[in-house]
Amino acid sequence: EWGILMYEGLLAVLALGTVALFREDVKRAFPFHRPTIAKTVGTVLMWIGTLLITMIPTSILLYVFPEQMSGATESVSELSGGLPFGIAFLLICVTPAIFEEMAFRGGLFSCFRGFRSPWLAILISAVVFGAFHGSFWRFVPTAMLGIAMGYLLAETDNMFYNMLFHLINNALPTLLLQLTSSVASEQMESAEAMASTGILLVTVAVYFIYASAGPFLLYAGNYLIHKG
């Protein structure tokens, strides 16, 4: 547990070092302002919309490469296994939301703020963010989440919202694991066996249907983060 905390803390130190190296203004690199209700709701809607859209590459990869995808999703379960919920929430949800956002949407993002289009900073930070998680199979959906968080920062100039997005995204699997921790081991083994053998094509189609709601939620969220 301490190793994870120190590792995440090192990211924050590197972010601060990067800002100092490039002589960036700390307040500009890590902008924080009082959040508004509209922007907060918009952030939640954008997270839901992004999550639904990431179902498309995730379901395709799960259908084509079931064993690899099953292995890629075990890290959170292994990390939180046996830990009290409070500690698991701190390690998996809170510290990454703060320290990883400082590193990728803070230090790294600020290096490219001088360019005319913010999309260079958004895309580069998202690609590095996806690669940072060390799994080829998780790269695309993770990078897509990184794009959404970078966009939030670029449009709101407030790290509160991309940190909130990151926190919610990590909290969902953590909460689900806690809720299912009481399931009998036989049932868990059966579920893992089903995951390792893949999903039906009809399930992929269902995911695509869910994902179709994503653009509407992104539009609504985008409206609110600009309205608020």
Where are these regions (language model features)?
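Hydrophobic core of alpha-helical transmembrane segments in multi-pass integral membrane proteins
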Residues: 11-19, 47-55, 201-226
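Alpha-helical transmembrane segments in multi-pass membrane proteins
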Residues: 1-23
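Hydrophobic residues within alpha-helical transmembrane segments
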Residues: 6, 45-46, 95, 124-128, ...
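Juxtamembrane helix-loop-helix connectors linking adjacent transmembrane helices
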Residues: 1-2, 27-98, 114, 187, ...
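Membrane-interface helix caps and helix-loop-helix hairpins in membrane proteins
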Residues: 131-137
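Hydrophobic alpha-helical transmembrane segments
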Residues: 5, 40-45, 86, 90, ...
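Functionally important transmembrane alpha-helices
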Residues: 126, 138-196
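Membrane-interface helix/loop boundary segments of multi-pass membrane proteins
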Residues: 99-124, 151-158
